[in-house]
Amino acid sequence: MSIWEYANPVKFMQTSGRLLPWVVAATVLTLLPGLVWGFFFTPVAAEFGATVKVIYVHVPAATLAINIWVMMLVASLIWLIRRHHVSALAAKAAAPIGMVMTLIALITGAFWGQPMWGTWWEWDPRLTSFLILFLFYLGYMALWEAIENPDTAADLTGVLCLVGSVFAVLSRYAAIFWNQGLHQGSTLSLDKEEHIADVYWQPLVLSIAGFGMLFVALLLLRTRTEIRARRLKALEQRERMA
């Protein structure tokens, strides 16, 4: 069976309907234990105090904010090259989720930065690139709503997605490329000097997995909703023409 068969809306609806309960169950079994473990059963860090608990929301949200845009880029490229409508609708469905995750990362980052750096905001390379990524999410969603023809909207948002990918990459690697700025290096790193203690990273990995499963569940739900809305609009147009 070719993977492109799942680009068929009927096939996608059938498969996603079967997968959705399992994905929701996996979300509950990873996200809740990860957050409870991290917030209530890890010690207060000597260096960071209780603020360290923010990482169990901040790091997963920031990770998703970047990776969701990458997923949107892949889906947009599939649309631009192969003209599969499900891929365009999946990119559209993912955008609000990515926007919320970026906003959560910015807000929780501010709560981390205020006690650590003495300021709610700093024009740090990674913080600035994340803010720009957030604006790209808003622009992507606004462009979809502003254009009535769905194929034209998918084309233009696909191009916007390509441009925004530069800032998605910068958001991920800014702390590596530029040493200046306040933002720390990667929380989960092979470098022992940067890598957090085991007592913190174990629930963090579980929380990241939970956020990832939550995204998959929301993506399936929203894509299914977009397909239904597209079908309903097509039926209404046929009725008006009849």
Curated annotation (Swiss-Prot):
Compartments it resides in: Cell inner membrane
One Gene Ontology cellular component annotation held by this UniProt entry: plasma membrane
Topological category with respect to the lipid bilayer: Multi-pass membrane protein
Domain of life: Bacteria
Keywords assigned by UniProt, alphabetized: Cell inner membrane, Cell membrane, Cytochrome c-type biogenesis, Membrane, Transmembrane, Transmembrane helix, Transport
Transmembrane segments: 21-41, 61-81, 93-113, 127-147, 158-178, 201-221
InterPro entries registered for this protein in UniProt: Cyt_c_assembly (IPR002541), Cyt_c_biogenesis_CcmC (IPR003557), Cyt_c_biogenesis_CcsA/CcmC (IPR045062)
Main location: membrane
Key word Heme present: no
Pfam families referenced in this protein's UniProt entry, alphabetically: Cytochrom_C_asm
A GO BP annotation: cytochrome complex assembly
GO molecular function, one term: heme binding
Chain coiled-coil ranges: none
PANTHER family documented for this protein: CYTOCHROME B_B6 PROTEIN-RELATED (PTHR30071:SF1), HEME EXPORTER PROTEIN C (PTHR30071)
Function noted in UniProt: Required for the export of heme to the periplasm for the biogenesis of c-type cytochromes.
Entry's family note: Belongs to the CcmC/CycZ/HelC family.
Protein name per the record: Heme exporter protein C
